[in-house]
Design a protein with these regions (language model features):
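Extracytoplasmic gate region of multi-pass secondary transporters
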Residues: 43-85, 89-92, 106
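Juxtamembrane intracellular "pre-TM" segments in multi-pass secondary transporters
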Residues: 20-50
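C-terminal transmembrane helical hairpin of 12-TM major facilitator-type secondary transporters
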Residues: 106-152
Length: 229
């Protein structure tokens, strides 16, 4: 039933895209050569690295939320769908809120997303003893990180120049790397005996790692602007 439900949502999404998106003019100046030149763009690669590292914490927690709740919190297996729904709700609301702040200042919005996400993991690790606080913490984890994807996508469009298509596709690849890397680190630490909360602490480190890379991107950008003057 889960697959049929997912397929139904996918079909409704296709219908919404067909009737809801405005028609856009094709960019006839786009070319494969221009796209490939984007591979030399340092800012594009650094921004992609922010997503590949900074978003990994969510996947570290999401991949092991079921055993964390059942083995550490000692919750019933029946609550897992509600926990996942709580995470999904946080992603929806968080994306809307982050978009509002991005309209005011994109770079500051990305910084605050990563900082607040790191704090949410700390709160989550300290809140998993009780089911109610665990649900709240899981919501905050997804709420705080939800905006990172679209915010980085927007920044990529700003720095990619004529390689817009390449940047957009690589952004998805970066988040797939985050998916694999976060889940791997969380699982590896559990296998090494660091306990069920280890994936949550991985989230703290990865969010801060993404923040450090972002600050490096800003510094590199300032140097590039100064060099052009």
């Amino acid at each position: 039933a889960g697959f049929e439900f997912s397929a139904s949502i996918a079909f409704l999404t296709v219908v919404a895209i067909c009737f809801g998106l405005p028609k856009m003019q094709l960019d006839h100046t786009a070319s494969i050569q221009n796209e490939l030149r984007g591979l030399k763009n340092t800012q594009m690669w650094i921004t992609l690295a922010v997503g590949a590292i900074g978003f990994g914490g969510l996947f570290s927690v999401y991949s092991y939320v079921s055993p964390i709740l059942t083995e550490y919190t000692h919750a019933s297996i029946q609550v897992i769908p509600f926990a996942l729904a709580c995470i999904g709700l946080g992603l929806v609301i968080g994306g809307l809120v982050a978009g509002h702040f991005a309209d005011k200042n994109l770079n500051k919005a990305i910084i605050w997303v990563l900082v607040s996400n790191a704090c949410s993991y700390v709160l989550c690790a300290l809140s998993m003893d009780h089911l109610a606080t665990a649900f709240i913490a899981l919501f905050l984890v997804s709420f705080s990180i939800a905006g990172l994807g679209p915010l980085l996508q927007t920044r990529l469009m700003d720095v990619a120049g004529n390689a817009q298509g390449l940047a957009a596709s690589l952004n998805h690849s970066a988040f797939n790397i985050a998916n694999a890397f976060g889940a791997f680190l969380g699982g590896w630490l559990i296998s090494q005996g660091f306990g069920w909360l280890a994936p949550i602490w991985v989230g703290v480190l990865l969010s801060l790692g993404g923040l450090m890379i972002l600050l490096l991107a800003f510094q590199h950008e300032k140097k590039s602007i100064s060099a052009c003057k």
